[in-house]
Amino acid sequence: MTKPLRIAINGYGRIGRCFLRALHESPCREHLTVVAINEPAALESIAYLTQFDSTHGRFPSTVALQGQQLLIDGQAIAVSHETTPEAVNWKALGIDLVVECSGHYSTRPELERFIAAGCPRLLLSHPANSAADVDATI
């Protein structure tokens, strides 16, 4: 079995939380794992909003906190509270992909800030400003 793809989520609002939930409930989760979340909100709020969702109900697994980590079924997810992509050391996190869910970054120069900070690949959860701002649309 190959190593799971290590994913970080940047922006943990509605879209970031739905992405984590969908991945957690998917049979693909043995191939894809969230190892980091970057979100300015307080860690306690992140845990609470993960556990209780007004649309989707309770999270289907145990949600807890340990230090600066969110634990989902005992699996640790590192949490940072940076407000700019270059403030996160993506390379040190050992991630393979950042899923950009904040909606704040939509132009090529803005997105290249992630790459310059050590992010090997970036997937947007929202449309880029133009086709010229991204390498591919999936």
PLM region descriptions:
Residues 2-138:
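N-terminal Rossmann-like NAD(P) cofactor-binding subdomain of oxidoreductases
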